[in-house]
């Protein structure tokens, strides 16, 4: 089953991915990555990618100047592309958090995700409003859940059951 989760920023998409990972990691191999916020003194200063298999981290974006930008963030396209080389994709379940505007600055990331699309078990988080041919394809081919504070725990349990079966 291919599942995508979307919702507004901060609603719990990454937390949902971590819950699914925690529930399934002893029952099957799980690869992929999550994206975590980095805060300093309570202020978000960027995002780091975290490999679910190795724990390796790489900056995805930071506040500052750079060629590839999304809002106030400079996207570390080169770092993202190097990070992808070590992400485990031969697992029973691959989690990609997130397919969004920052990641889509990289053609290599787009190809990386396209190469996963034929897999049987996938869990992606997708940006709520972004338009891109890859996001359109995911919306067509995946079961898409829109989460909020009232349904995120129930949906995490439902997705775990679906992906386990």
Curated annotation (Swiss-Prot):
Its EC number is 3.6.1.15. Keywords: ATP-binding, Hydrolase, Nucleotide-binding. Gene3D superfamilies: P-loop containing nucleotide triphosphate hydrolases (3.40.50.300). One of its GO terms (molecular function) is ATP binding. Pfam families: NTPase_1 (PF03266). It catalyses: a ribonucleoside 5'-triphosphate + H2O = a ribonucleoside 5'-diphosphate + phosphate + H(+). ATP binds at residues 7-14, 93-100. The keyword Cell wall biogenesis/degradation does not apply. CDD domains: RecA-like_Thep1. PANTHER family: CANCER-RELATED NUCLEOSIDE-TRIPHOSPHATASE. Has nucleotide phosphatase activity towards ATP, GTP, CTP, TTP and UTP. May hydrolyze nucleoside diphosphates with lower efficiency. Belongs to the THEP1 NTPase family. HAMAP family: NTPase_1. This is Nucleoside-triphosphatase THEP1. It comes from Archaeoglobus fulgidus (strain ATCC 49558 / DSM 4304 / JCM 9628 / NBRC 100126 / VC-16).
